[in-house]
């Protein structure tokens, strides 16, 4: 999944979008593939986030997140199953009255045993579905 990036414009102010992105424990409420999530080691604007996600099979991984309110959230890989690396970001920009341009970028290196078809499915299917779920959450009253 090298260099996968998508941009959406949402009908929500930048602060709300940032809040949704950084309320990690609420992800299972609107992202059905997230089966469990917990945070630890919060220090200022950084936190470690531990995921359990179901993509073909259930895998666990951990990332170190840096939050730059209200315009950016980025992460780097700590450890995980079937993964060699996972880094990326959300970059937020005001887009007119009450709207936000949100760009999601991820660079993920999966293990050699992971079939290319799984990697393609993640990019072509999972990423758009995830962004649609975030958009609905951003725009919810």
Predicted regions and their residues:
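Ser/Thr-centric signal marking residues that sit
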Residues: 22, 100-103
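Short beta-strand micro-motifs in enzyme catalytic cores
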Residues: 45-49, 100
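Hydrophobic ligand-binding cavity/cleft-lining segments
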Residues: 1-44, 129, 133, 140
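Hydrophobic-ligand binding "helix-grip"
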Residues: 29, 40, 52-99, 107-109, ...
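A conserved amphipathic terminal alpha-helix motif
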Residues: 103, 107-141
